[in-house]
């Protein structure tokens, strides 16, 4: 499949099929609150369970059903842990068209949210943003 992709074939997926496009794939499980459901209540380090995806997108993490299932905190948590990766939150009936060397095109009925954290700062409760 990867050879076809490199050769210019169109690869697509919905739901988990979209998530598996990235090298780092979100499984949907939480380490700290395994029974919390689809809505991620907090931004927490080392909480999101990931596995290796197909790797068509090597510098991105894809999350699906994004706004509908309120998965902002899940994707923010991962992007903060892996600032070299860009997080793409994709809604239902929406697609990201990725072609070599060009901007991503958003098509469909809803939106794609992009999180990029290379200059992000994280402050724990009670800490200052200017220092420890």
Q: Where are the language model's segments positioned?
A:
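C-terminal and late-domain segments of enzyme folds
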Residues: 25-27, 31-132
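Active-site or ligand-binding cleft "flap/edge" segments
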Residues: 1
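Catalytic nucleophile loop
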Residues: 4-24
């Amino acid at each position: 499949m990867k050879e076809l992709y490199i050769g210019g074939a169109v690869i697509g997926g919905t739901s988990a099929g979209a998530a598996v496009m990235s090298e780092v794939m979100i499984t949907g499980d939480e380490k700290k609150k395994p029974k919390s459901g689809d809505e991620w209540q907090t931004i927490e380090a080392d909480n999101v369970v990931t596995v290796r995806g197909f790797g068509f997108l090597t510098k991105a993490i894809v999350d699906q059903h994004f706004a509908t299932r309120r998965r902002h905190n899940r994707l923010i948590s991962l992007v903060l842990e892996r600032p070299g990766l860009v997080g793409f939150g994709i809604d239902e009936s929406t697609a990201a068209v990725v072609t070599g060397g060009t901007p991503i095109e958003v098509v469909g009925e809803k939106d794609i949210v992009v999180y990029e954290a290379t200059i992000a700062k994280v402050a724990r409760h009670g800490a200052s943003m200017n220092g420890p």
